[in-house]
Amino acid sequence: MRYEVDKRRRIVRVTPERDEDLYFLYLLIDVGDVVRGWTVREYKPDGTKEGERVKMFLGIKVEALEYHKFRGSLRVRGPVVEVEEGIEGVKGRRHTFDIVAGREVEIEKGDEEALEAAEGVLEMAKGILPRILLVSVDDEEAAFAYVTALGVEVLYFLRNDARRGGEEGSLLDEFLAAVGKATENLRRRYNPDKVVLAGPHIILEHVARYVHGDRIPQSSGGLAGVYEFVRRGLYDAFKAEIGFSAYEKLLQLLATNSERVATGPKDVEEAASAGRIDALLVLDSFIKENPREVWAIISRAYKSRSKIFIIREDTEIGVGLRAMGGVAAILRW
């Protein structure tokens, strides 16, 4: 994601570069913000009978947002508050921006605190990890997962039904050839930055004939192998970036040294005001439910150089964080 911050005008100019960037834009755009950009809408000049689709530069005051992870789309709705000179009859009418990868938009935040918090979110997005197509395979099944900074999404299963009869070697090759074909189909669809093969070492030796990618030997393949890949220290950098490691440390401190942990908005806000936060974990849905309160916390954490992790609600960590009040922090002292 490319972005530029104009602090004097409280404006962020952003060009999303891939679908994951749309998620971070969804988080930092609030109701009441002004979003500007090039768009196409129906325009009927005075004195004409029929309208036509015209490209124009508009600004809308945000009333609603709609983000679809699986479609990779972000829509922003609201009344038009700014329009380029020479375009009449559009201001005040409602419009929907489709924010897509490769198209720049401007976001004008309502106050300085929200702008500073938005910078923290953008810094997190800038350090986003490669998108990984994980192929977890053993001699019984293969599971395919899409691993990004947004979490782990299991895409597809393939069972080795041919194991029921026939020659073992040829049947395994038949199954692995099907794994290779499925991998290529998913590679074309999702365009990952890399493919990672995970599973028992002896199986990986065979899989490599059909699928090209980084090999990660582990004890299990299939769906169990997906969870093993995420839980074990096989991809520590990835785990750290999306908050797994911070959440594990938070749970450990809750059990052994609870004074080093703050949970819930009130306690976390107090810790943020005192500059005590080392790592902040915030539920994505909690941001949309309480934007002013959460942006204030994120802004203070960002100023004190805290690590910030935004956690999706539809993950294992998200369920635990929701039970803690939607926000939690590991404290420096």
Swiss-Prot record:
**Cross-referenced InterPro entries:** eFR1_2_sf, eRF1_1_Pelota, eRF1_3, Pelota/DOM34_N, Pelota_arc, Ribosomal_eL30-like_sf, Transl-rel_pelota
Record's subcellular location:
Cytoplasm
* Cofactor(s) required for function per UniProt: a divalent metal cation
Sorted alphabetically, which Pfam families does this protein's record hold?
Answer: eRF1_1, eRF1_3
Write the Enzyme Commission number(s) for this entry: 3.1.-.-
For this record, the Gene Ontology CC terms, alphabetical, are: cytoplasm
Q: What's any GO biological process attached to this entry? A: ribosome disassembly
Q: What is its main location?
A: cytoplasm
Quick check: keyword Hydrolase in the entry?
Answer: yes
Q: Which SMART domains match?
A: eRF1_1
Q: Which GO molecular function terms does the record list?
A: endonuclease activity; metal ion binding
Keywords assigned by UniProt, alphabetized: Cytoplasm, Endonuclease, Hydrolase, Metal-binding, Nuclease
Relay the domain remarks.
Answer: The N-terminal domain has the RNA-binding Sm fold. It harbors the endoribonuclease activity.
Assembly and interaction partners = Monomer.
| Biological role | May function in recognizing stalled ribosomes, interact with stem-loop structures in stalled mRNA molecules, and effect endonucleolytic cleavage of the mRNA. May play a role in the release non-functional ribosomes and degradation of damaged mRNAs. Has endoribonuclease activity.
* Name used for this protein in its record: Protein pelota homolog
Q: Which organism is it from?
A: Pyrobaculum arsenaticum (strain DSM 13514 / JCM 11321 / PZ6)
In the UniProt record, the gene name given for this protein reads: pelA
